[in-house]
């Protein structure tokens, strides 16, 4: 419900807030590296026996044989279980090495995260007018590393008796939000989804401190979820929104009241994102690209009503309402720009469109939101007899 001011005449200042820590609940109990590898070997043995094709289980990293052989380093071409691999020819990103590990990808991605909320309010008023003002700050660090959501919000709700027969007021809210666009759906792009697809024997980092991943042969096609989050930490999405209504109410005659109400909802969004290369990914390193997107949209609703309210002989009550309502929506635009192949993808100072390659992959696009309008007339009649029987017509 909307908070309103009081008629006490004394201003009332309030504060409400909390600070806490949040953590994800129970996670899936997954196999460690050796159990996962032994299970994979057992599955291959069963497949060989069922198909009666002979041979032994194999993996590019762990060789071929009755049991997997653990190499001293995983390699991009496949270590074949060798324990004498020399990593001195390390050359990122084409020739990399990483030790056999027991990585719990969930634990690497998950964290205890702070959440806080602070709100101050000021309310008061007299018979001539009331007010309720508030300001709020909310910050939630995500349980996924390098993720967050923050919001600044102010509200104003006022009403004034200008004359005995005239009243005006408003109820307006402004909010600014910012986050880094963390995916919350159930698709494979969800960070937690990657934690169950990643091979546990691959570490987060290789021997040189660069991100490790599925480019090590025989480890699947997963993307390193920690790498994805770190690379996306400077991306952000902002939204400015103003919404609320202004109203006025006038008593034309003793039993006849006119009310007008104008509501508006304006939103401006801005999207700022660098999609970086993924050198440790098995499918493709990809091209980096930087995209900026800006859009705005607003809608308004204007409602006018006449209300006749009359009581006859203390037992007959009649209320007649007539009104109009007009709506406009889709009053906005969207602009998108994108360019590829940035030389310094980690330097946010270079994240501007004209620093990218001006080739045929560039994107410059604008969209029209699709304006539409509605207008309606409505009416309602309510009659009650002795506060026992009610009849309504619309």
Language model segments and positions:
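Outer-membrane beta-barrel initiation region
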Residues: 108-112, 122-126
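A beta-strand signature from Gram-negative outer-membrane beta-barrel systems
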Residues: 1-14, 115-117, 130, 136-138
């Amino acid at each position: 419900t909307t908070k309103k001011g009081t008629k006490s005449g004394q201003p009332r200042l309030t504060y409400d807030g909390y600070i806490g820590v949040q953590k994800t609940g129970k996670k899936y109990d997954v196999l460690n590296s050796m159990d996962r590898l032994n299970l994979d070997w057992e599955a291959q043995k069963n497949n060989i026996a069922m198909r009666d094709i002979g041979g032994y289980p194999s993996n590019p990293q762990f060789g071929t044989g009755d049991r997997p052989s653990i190499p001293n380093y995983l390699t991009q071409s496949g270590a074949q279980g060798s324990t004498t691999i020399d990593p001195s020819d390390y050359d990122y990103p084409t020739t990399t090495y990483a030790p056999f590990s027991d990585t719990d990808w969930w634990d690497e991605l998950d964290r205890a995260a702070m959440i806080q909320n602070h709100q101050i309010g000021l309310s008061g008023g007299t018979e001539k007018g009331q007010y309720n003002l508030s300001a709020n700050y909310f910050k939630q660090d995500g349980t996924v590393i390098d993720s967050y959501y923050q919001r600044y919000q102010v509200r104003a709700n006022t009403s004034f008796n200008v004359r005995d027969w005239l009243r005006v007021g408003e109820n307006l809210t402004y909010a600014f939000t910012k986050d880094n666009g963390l995916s919350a759906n159930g698709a494979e792009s969800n960070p937690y989804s990657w934690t169950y697809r990643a091979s546990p024997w691959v570490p987060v980092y290789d021997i040189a401190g660069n991100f490790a991943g599925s480019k090590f042969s025989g480890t699947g096609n997963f993307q390193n979820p920690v790498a994805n989050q770190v690379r996306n930490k400077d991306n952000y999405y902002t939204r400015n929104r103003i919404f609320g209504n202004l109203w006025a109410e006038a008593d034309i005659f003793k039993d006849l009241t006119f009310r007008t109400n104008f509501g508006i909802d304006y939103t401006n969004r801005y999207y700022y994102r660098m999609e970086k290369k993924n050198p440790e990914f098995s499918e493709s390193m990809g091209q980096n690209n930087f995209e900026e997107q800006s859009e705005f949209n607003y809608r308004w609703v204007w409602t006018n009503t006449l209300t006749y309210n009359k009581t006859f002989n203390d037992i007959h009550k009649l209320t007649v309402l007539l009104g109009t309502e007009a709506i406009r929506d889709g009053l906005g635009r969207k602009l998108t720009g994108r360019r590829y192949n940035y030389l310094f993808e980690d330097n946010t100072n270079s994240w501007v469109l004209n620093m990218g390659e001006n080739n045929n992959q560039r994107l410059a696009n604008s969209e029209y939101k699709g304006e539409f309008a509605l207008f309606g007339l409505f009416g309602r009649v309510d009659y009650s007899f002795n506060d026992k029987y009610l009849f309504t017509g619309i």
